Design a protein with these regions (language model features):
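Structural motif
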Residues: 82-84, 146-154
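Conserved beta-propeller blade repeats
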Residues: 111, 121, 125, 165, ...
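Residue position within the beta-strands of beta-propeller blades
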Residues: 73, 137-141, 186-190
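Amphipathic beta-strand/beta-sheet edge segments enriched in Tyr/Trp
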Residues: 54-121
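Short, solvent-exposed, polar/charged sequence segments at loop or secondary-structure edges
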Residues: 16-28, 34-83
Length: 191
């Protein structure tokens, strides 16, 4: 089924830091799912119920009224071990929870990666297909005039976000044909 699915999302935040983390996660997940072409995010102005749903059962009838087929509820809080994310995914029309997740993010620099991972979980749970949002792309960046080309090995997230882009070589040597090793932890390339 390639029809778009309405997704409501509610995030509870404790303070300005967790609000920032929650907003970042929300934006990443919403962008990923919307860009897949299979989802749309229901306009937040239409929400009837918007309090913390992580600890409560949603009023499914309210969400049906605004055409949300699925609901993602999350709570972001700060702990001494990092940023805690609790998430629940609901099937609104069948009035049931279909996924539950709790994890601690030890480093705020991993927020984007966690957003992509949660997107994969939501995508897979709803569509039955493996998500692709936590994908890294390795490539050769080329700059300069044709006769003085500088080639550098680079890596980025699948969405190309500026925060995920990183050069891995300095451009002093030519790089060709980058590939991930089978363990996905190393990159091989010809120099």
């Amino acid at each position: 089924n390639t029809r778009s699915r309405g997704l409501g999302d509610v995030y509870k935040r404790q303070d300005s830091d967790t609000a920032r983390y929650g907003n970042t996660l929300r934006q990443i997940i919403s962008n990923n799912l919307t860009n897949s072409g299979l989802f749309y995010t229901v306009n937040e102005d239409l929400y009837i119920q918007s309090d913390n749903l992580v600890e409560k059962v949603p009023r499914f009838e309210d969400w049906k009224l605004i055409k949300a087929q699925f609901l993602l509820s999350a709570d972001v809080s700060k702990t001494d071990k990092g940023i805690r994310l609790r998430m629940r995914l609901y099937d609104v029309f069948n009035a049931k929870e279909i996924e539950k997740l709790q994890l601690t993010i030890p480093d705020e620099n991993l927020i984007r990666r966690v957003g992509h991972t949660v997107s994969d979980i939501v995508y897979e749970r709803i569509t039955g297909e493996t998500g692709y949002f936590d994908t890294r792309i390795v490539y050769v960046s080329e700059i300069g005039p044709l006769d003085q080309r500088v080639k550098r090995l680079a890596i980025m997230d699948q969405d190309g976000h500026i925060d995920s882009h990183q050069f891995l070589t300095d451009g002093k040597n030519m790089v060709l044909t980058p590939r991930f090793a089978p363990n996905k932890q190393l990159i091989t390339y010809m120099e």
